[in-house]
């Protein structure tokens, strides 16, 4: 690892650091003496020590902060302790009724740039830990971190996910944020064999997960609880599932007794996976319609034809990759929400 450097702030720019915001943009820095990708001590304009993090000269977010304890070295013990804290925090949560979960969520767990999702296959009881190194600071120490993860993430550490045998680690560092960090994508096995398509459980339902080429790390784990919540409103309902991906909301809705589900997505392959998920759960295929196409255009067509639904699910992708795209993204989110509301029956 590169030696510790320093990043001195411009006068009056220390407030966000004191308030423990994890990012420092280039405009806040007066002078940096550090190696690209190396660790830095962040100093106020008058030289006071404020925090410690890692540095990327090519990113708009030039320093990502890790600790506000001057006596805390950024060694392997630090990273292990942060991982253990993240996993332990999830252990205290109520039962998940799922065999997959995000166990490390970057800044939210004090580990900016590191994501780790665990999928336990319900058939073989083998597990795949899908990891993402999204920042340069994680990239330069990825080997150490990837060796630590299987030591921390064990069946005993997260009993809510059940037991598993062999654990493979697979890297899906292909998010757009790597390009913003000046890095190319990387998708490859870290340890263990190349994973096959998995089948995970969620609230008693089975879902196909392609960790090699599916969206994100294979499944939208952030919507896991929401899929069950939405299903409570779907009994006897006609449901529109826009941006359906592999049909998670639709499968939950049909299990809850929806009269019909219309899955709309741009990806024909994702819709095909949704069809397989339906069959995997012995749900009636005749109550599901799938439409491959531009979601905005499809919803406008439904609006113009006067088609209405009792429940409309909108789970669009990220529309803005940077601040220059925010205005256009805002229009996109406004348009899709207005379209969704126009397709709701009164009381829907």
Q: What is each model feature region?
A:
Residues 1-120:
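Non-catalytic accessory regions of SAM-dependent methyltransferases
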Residues 44, 54, 133-134, 211:
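Short clusters of small/polar residues that mark proteolytic maturation junctions
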Residues 64-74, 129-142:
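Short histidine-centered catalytic/ligand-binding loop motif
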Residues 75-81, 85-89, 93, 154-181, ...:
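A short, charged
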Residues 76, 138-142, 146, 223, ...:
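Short, charged, low-complexity patches
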Residues 104-122, 141-219:
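Non-catalytic substrate-recognition/targeting regions of SAM-dependent transferases
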Residues 116-118, 125-132:
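Carbohydrate-binding surface patches
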Residues 187-348:
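Rossmann-like S-adenosyl-L-methionine
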